A protein has these predicted regions:
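Periplasmic OmpA-like peptidoglycan-binding domain that tethers envelope proteins to the cell wall
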Residues: 29-36, 57-126
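Periplasmic peptidoglycan-binding/tethering modules of Gram-negative envelope proteins
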Residues: 1-53
């Protein structure tokens, strides 16, 4: 059973480590050192909660082509999921989802808006 405290812990992880994908990836879609800290926290959370299933969603802004943005976001989501699998989390408990620029949370007319749209989301799968 997934409880509100688990959801709150996921939200807290993102608040502590940030949601910007720039925090997690370099220009070659490799994880930055900061990403490992957050992902290791997710491993511990998932080990404590064996029923927890998680989607890692990666979003981009609208710069570049929609196809390229979708590809890079899916690649980044899969890189994060692969790390969790390599740390012992069963693949059936994880989903990697690249959204590209399809779900903006801000406008794309300024750098600050685009930066908000380039983000990582952790979503509980029911």
């Amino acid at each position: 059973v997934i409880t509100d405290p688990i959801r709150k812990e996921l939200i807290s992880l993102l608040k502590n480590y940030g949601i910007s994908d720039e925090f997690y990836f370099d220009n070659y879609n490799r994880l930055r050192a900061n990403a490992y800290l957050m992902l290791d926290q997710i491993v511990m959370l998932m080990n404590r909660n064996p029923a927890l299933r998680l989607e890692i969603g990666v979003h981009t802004d609208n710069a570049g082509s929609a196809a390229a943005n979708l590809k890079v976001s899916q690649t980044r989501a899969q890189v994060m999921v692969n790390y969790l699998i390599n740390r012992g989390i069963e693949s059936k408990r994880l989903a990697a989802k690249g959204y590209g620029g399809a779900k903006p949370i801000s406008h794309n007319t300024s750098e600050s808006g685009r930066k908000m749209n380039r983000r990582i989301e952790l979503n509980v799968i029911n």
